[in-house]
């Protein structure tokens, strides 16, 4: 016997796809699918177009690995930013969060994963940009502490100052779950790593 739900394959497929977005549960996915499919199909078309454009144009900056729509991102090509400081973050989304604070005027380097770090290119960048300080803007975890020590060891011959953002950022919490005041305070109170 066919049920009503079985006859709505396309709608249920949309719900299933939306549910795969982080932090979106089945009820929220259903509400979004219903809204986009029935109440506001124009918005659905706008979202589709925006997704196509983003997928077609987004790439990573060849210098810092942040999101960009060109070979080199706006931050790396901005001559007015301080070259002496390089802020290392784990994910491209962390650059968005820190930039919103407007507390850091230096450059960034997005790690993504330690396996992907091109230390030769990073070392070249340290020399060319005359970087004096590396700021680790990582959420505090034992794994991230180990990562900082590893990077410090790999770059010790450059006699850099290594700092990390101060505690106050709860252990095990991602940046997007921290209020901007706490994150700003932690960033401005960074300590030697």
UniProtKB/Swiss-Prot annotation:
The keyword DNA damage applies. A zinc finger (C4-type) spans 61-76. It comes from the Bacteria. InterPro entries: DNA_Rcmb_RecR, Rcmb_RecR, Rcmb_RecR_Znf, TOPRIM_dom, TOPRIM_RecR. GO terms for biological process: DNA recombination; DNA repair. Keywords: DNA damage, DNA recombination, DNA repair, Metal-binding, Zinc, Zinc-finger. Pfam families: RecR_HhH, RecR_ZnF. GO terms for molecular function: DNA binding; zinc ion binding. Residues 84-170 form the Toprim domain. NCBIfam families: recR. May play a role in DNA repair. It seems to be involved in an RecBC-independent recombinational process of DNA repair. It may act with RecF and RecO. Belongs to the RecR family. This is Recombination protein RecR. It comes from Helicobacter pylori (strain G27). The gene is recR.
């Amino acid at each position: 016997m066919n049920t009503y739900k079985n006859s709505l394959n396309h709608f249920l497929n949309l719900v299933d796809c939306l549910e795969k977005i982080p932090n979106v549960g089945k009820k929220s996915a259903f509400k979004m699918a219903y809204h986009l499919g029935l109440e506001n199909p124009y918005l659905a078309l706008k979202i589709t177009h925006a997704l196509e454009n983003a997928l077609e144009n987004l790439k990573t900056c060849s210098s810092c690995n942040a999101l960009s729509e060109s070979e080199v991102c706006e931050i790396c090509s901005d001559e007015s930013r301080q070259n002496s400081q390089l802020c290392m973050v784990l994910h491209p989304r962390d650059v968005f969060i820190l930039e919103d604070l407007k507390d850091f005027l230096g450059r960034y380097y997005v790690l993504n994963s330690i396996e992907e770090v091109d230390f030769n290119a990073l070392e070249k960048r340290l020399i060319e940009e005359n970087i004096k300080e590396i700021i680790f803007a990582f959420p505090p975890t034992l794994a991230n502490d180990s990562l900082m020590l590893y990077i410090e060891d790999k770059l010790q011959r450059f006699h850099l100052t290594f700092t990390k953002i101060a505690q106050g950022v709860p252990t095990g919490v991602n940046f997007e779950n921290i209020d901007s005041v706490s994150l700003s305070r932690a960033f401005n109170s960074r300590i030697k790593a």
